[in-house]
Structure formats: C-alpha cells, structure tokens
C-alpha cells in the first residue's frame, strides 16, 4: 500500500508511534550512561548505570573502596539519575559550607513523602518553610540556652543513669536510651522518661529501627530514578510501599499521642517551659498545621534520643576492648574529681580526654555512615567536572573517618588523635580543620549539636567516674564494623555483654545521694 494513500489519521498515528519509539530507544540508550564531563566512577551498564553494583546494605564500605580507585568525589548513575559521592573532607568546606545556598536541598523521594508527607525537617526540601522551622528549633536549643538552662535537666538525668547502672546492670543496653530520650522529651514536651520500660521510649526505638532500614541507601527500589517501577506490583519489589506506609503510621501515631498529651496538660492550665509549649503559644504569629506540629516534635525526639544513646553504647563497648583508654580516662577524672561528687558540666574543660574519647567515637563508629543525601539546586563544577542540577550528594562519612591517609590505623580506637581539638564539635563545624562529621555539614548540620555534645560529655564523664566496664569472662563482644552493628542508615552496636564494676564504695553513697537530689529537677515534670 502506498503510504500516501493512508488517511491523515493513520499517518498521524504512524508518526506518533515512530516518534515515541525513537524517544524510548534514545532514552534507553542514554539511561545509565555517564557523560564524560561528569566526575569519573565505576563502569556503567546500559539502562541500569551502576544500580546493580550498589549494595543494598552497608554501601559505605563499597563507596570507600571506590573512593580509593576513583578519588575523593566520583559519580554513580542510577538509571537516569546522578549521584555524586564525596569522600574528601576538603570538599565539604568547598561545597556544602561555602555554597550552602545550592547544596542544602534534598533529593526528591517518594518513600520519604509516603512516610512524612514532606513535613519532616530531615527530609523536607530547602526553602522558606524549612528555614522557619529550623529557626524555631535553633532559638530553643542554641548554645546560650543550653548553658543557662538545659544542663540542669541533663545533669539530673545523668545522675539517674548512674543509679540505674548501679541498681539494674542487667539493663545496661537500655540505660543510655532512657537517659537521652528523657532529656529530649523533658525539654521538648515537658514529659520525662522515668524508666527503661516507658512505652513512648519503646515505641520510638522500634520506630527508629524500622525507619533506619527503609531509608538506607539501596534498601528501596529506585522508584525515584525509574518511575515505571512504581507501577510494578510491590510484592515483586520487597513490599517497599507497605514498609514506608507502616513507618509513617507508626510516626503519626506516636507523635500525635505525645502532642495530644501536651495539649491536654495545657487545657488543665498546666504550662511548662518546654519547646512545644512555646511553639503552641506562638501559633498565631507562626501558624503550623497539625502534621507540621507532629513532625516538629517528632524530629527532635528522634534526633535527641538515638544518636546520643548509640554513641554512649559505642564508647562503653570500646572501653571493654581498650582498657588502656579507660584507665587513662579514670586517671584524669580522679585527678580532678573526688569521691564526694560526680563530674558536672562545669568540669568539662578540665577533662580534655573525655572530649577526645567522644570525638574518637564519632570517627570510629559514625552513627550515620553515609549521612542523609543532599541535592544540588543548580549546575556546579568541581575541578572542571560538572555536578548537574538535581544530583544527589552523598557524604561518605565512613570513608572520610577511616581514611588511612589522615588517620593512622583507623580501625583502632585511639582518642589521642584529637589532642589538638580541645573545643566542642560546634567550634570546628564549617572550618577548614574539622574534627568529624558526626553532626552533618552545611546548613543541614544538626540543630541540636549543642545539646548533644553536652549529653555525651556529662554522661560519659559521670559513667567513667563511677564505673569500670569489663568484658564478661570468656566472652568476646563483636566490635566489627561489618557485623557488630545494626543495619540501616543509622548504626547502633548490637547487644553486648558487659560487667559493670563500681570503682569504690564511697561512690555508691554519692550516686544514691545525687539521685535523691535530682528529684528536685524531676519534680518540675510531675
């Protein structure tokens, strides 16, 4: 048949079909391809790019191997999406700090939206709304406020933590969780976590375990890179949507329950100087939706509870494996503090070795080995290589913290590495000479950094003043970074055995007395 004899509608159909086929073929040929103007990286395959090479768990180990081969920044192609992995700490200053106006965004994420409806500060897109919520948090947790007020709650909760270790050593994996969670909930909601059996605490850490697994890089099918996967039956792809919705439901339920408790207390005429009370007092000036209120409190509950407790558990485990470090800490504490009182926040500058131990724990076992991905808002260039607009920017925190060119024998726990870093972590954030990346970088740096540093210093100083931590006879706890920690985008040591030995009878009396004195602070939250 002569094509000229076809009806115009048939000709149009053929033309559209041919154009669509050509477009699809071109897309498939280009998808997964790494253009030459992008940073180098591992070889790609058509369509998939590097998707099949990215591990579904613990990707930071593979990223660190690739960094040795391809340099401090390299490109991964995931279908048509571009991911830039940074393993050179100098680039953190160059990009995320100096160009924070374009490197503070987040990659689009359907999973994050399903969980939070995009109202969670951690995954919220950078913009006016994000800046407003961030400012709200900063005003309550800025350093002067921590120095003036919050340390009293922190010291009281640390005194209970000593009492808990002394009287319930069998729950040693839970005491740091109660400590950090109670500080956070007291300051954010005016609600204490009185025991390790608290229902809010149990639900939060269960939720965090679930969310950590869902949010880990590589754990979810690339539904943002290859949208057609959204229409594949999810049972063929690990039930990714159901997993996300489950986490979202857990968040909504817990955060709404706590928020409702604050509102009910206020309706009874009981006001407290908590973060959420202040937010509710200013709703007319700063209107927030119910979902924004839920997640504003929730993000603080998460960040304030999980990171500090994970690091305290890491440090205690390190003490059992590195007794010479523990002995040195004991000696310094004993030279400053006697038996009649435990260390206080006011002692921190006299206990530099405690500060070194905390910095080394951030380096040795970072809680978030790959951080939370950033996204670049416009085209940028590094050393003549293009960083395309919309690229995901992954900070290989693990690789930078375990770079043998900077850290000799990086797998060893050696606090002396930080002898020349006497200030708190906030003093080095954004500087050329950074101690670690445990709190993130750029404008997305943890807004609770000042509170978290004090949680750790007060808690660890008191614990090492009071106790010696030992491995049980005949046991060998697993401190391997590959097998000794939980999976997900947040890492915490797996349960380990520990013998907790009181360092002197006099300290028992001090612990009991200080716990009784702490009740005066706790009474504010009854």
From Swiss-Prot:
It is an enzyme of class 1 (oxidoreductase). GO terms for molecular function: heme binding; iron ion binding; monooxygenase activity; oxidoreductase activity, acting on paired donors, with incorporation or reduction of molecular oxygen; polyketide synthase activity. Glycans are attached at residue 81. Its cofactor is heme. It is found in: Endoplasmic reticulum membrane. Patulin was originally used as an antibiotic and specifically trialed to be used against the common cold, but it is no longer used for that purpose since it has been shown to induce immunological, neurological and gastrointestinal effects. Genotoxic effects of patulin with dose-dependent increase in DNA strand breaks in brain, liver and kidneys have been detected in mice. However, more recently, it has been proposed that patulin might also have anti-tumor properties. GO terms for cellular component: endoplasmic reticulum; endoplasmic reticulum membrane. It is a single-pass membrane protein. Heme binds at residue 446. Pathway: Mycotoxin biosynthesis; patulin biosynthesis. This is Cytochrome P450 monooxygenase patI. The lineage of its organism: Eukaryota, Fungi, Dikarya, Ascomycota, Pezizomycotina.
């Amino acid at each position: 048949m002569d094509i000229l004899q076809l009806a115009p509608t048939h000709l149009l159909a053929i033309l559209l079909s041919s154009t669509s086929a050509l477009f699809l073929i071109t897309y498939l040929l280009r998808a997964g391809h790494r253009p030459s103007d992008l940073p180098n990286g591992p070889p790609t395959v058509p369509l998939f790019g590097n998707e099949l090479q990215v591990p579904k768990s613990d990707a930071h180990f593979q990223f660190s191997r690739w960094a040795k081969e391809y340099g401090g920044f390299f490109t991964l192609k995931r279908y048509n999406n571009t991911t830039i992995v940074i393993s050179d700490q100098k680039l953190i200053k160059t990009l995320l700090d100096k160009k924070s106006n374009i490197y503070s965004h987040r990659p689009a994420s359907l999973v994050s939206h399903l969980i939070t409806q995009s109202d969670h500060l951690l995954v919220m897109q950078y913009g006016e709304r994000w800046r407003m919520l961030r400012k709200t948090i900063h005003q309550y947790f800025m350093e002067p406020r921590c120095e003036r007020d919050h340390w009293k709650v922190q010291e009281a909760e640390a005194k209970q933590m000593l009492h808990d270790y002394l009287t319930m050593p069998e729950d040693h994996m839970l005491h740091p969780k109660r400590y950090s969670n109670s500080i956070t909930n007291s300051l954010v909601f005016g609600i204490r976590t009185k025991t390790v059996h608290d229902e809010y605490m149990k639900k939060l850490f269960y939720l965090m375990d679930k969310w950590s697994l869902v949010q880990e890089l590589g754990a979810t099918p690339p539904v943002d890179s290859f949208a057609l996967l959204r229409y594949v039956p999810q049972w063929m792809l690990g039930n990714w949507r159901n997993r996300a919705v489950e986490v979202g439901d857990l968040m909504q339920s817990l955060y709404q329950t706590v928020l409702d408790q604050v509102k009910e207390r206020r309706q009874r005429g009981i006001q407290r100087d908590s973060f959420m009370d202040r937010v509710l007092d200013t709703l007319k000036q700063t209107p927030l939706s119910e979902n924004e209120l839920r997640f504003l409190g929730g993000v603080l509950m998460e960040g304030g509870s999980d990171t500090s407790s994970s690091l305290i558990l890491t440090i205690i485990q390190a003490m059992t494996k590195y007794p010479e470090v523990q002995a040195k800490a004991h000696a310094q504490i004993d030279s400053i503090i006697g038996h009649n009182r435990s260390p206080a926040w006011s002692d921190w500058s006299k206990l530099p070795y405690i500060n070194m131990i905390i910095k080394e724990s951030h380096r040795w076992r970072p809680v978030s080995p790959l951080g939370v991905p950033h996204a670049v808002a416009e085209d940028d260039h590094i050393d003549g290589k293009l960083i395309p607009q919309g690229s995901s920017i992954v900070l290989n925190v693990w690789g930078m913290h375990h770079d043998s060119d900077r850290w000799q024998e990086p797998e060893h726990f050696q606090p002396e590495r930080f002898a020349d870093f006497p200030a708190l972590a906030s003093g080095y954030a954004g500087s050329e000479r950074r101690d670690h990346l445990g709190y993130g970088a750029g404008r997305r740096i943890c807004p609770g950094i000042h509170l978290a540093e004090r949680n750790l210093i007060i808690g660890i100083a008191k614990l090492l003043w009071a106790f010696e931590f030992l491995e049980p006879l005949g046991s060998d706890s697993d401190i391997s970074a590959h097998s000794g920690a939980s999976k997900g985008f947040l890492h915490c040591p797996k349960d380990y055995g520990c013998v907790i030995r009181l360092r002197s009878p006099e300290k028992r009396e001090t612990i009991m007395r200080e716990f009784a004195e702490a009740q005066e602070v706790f009474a504010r939250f009854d």
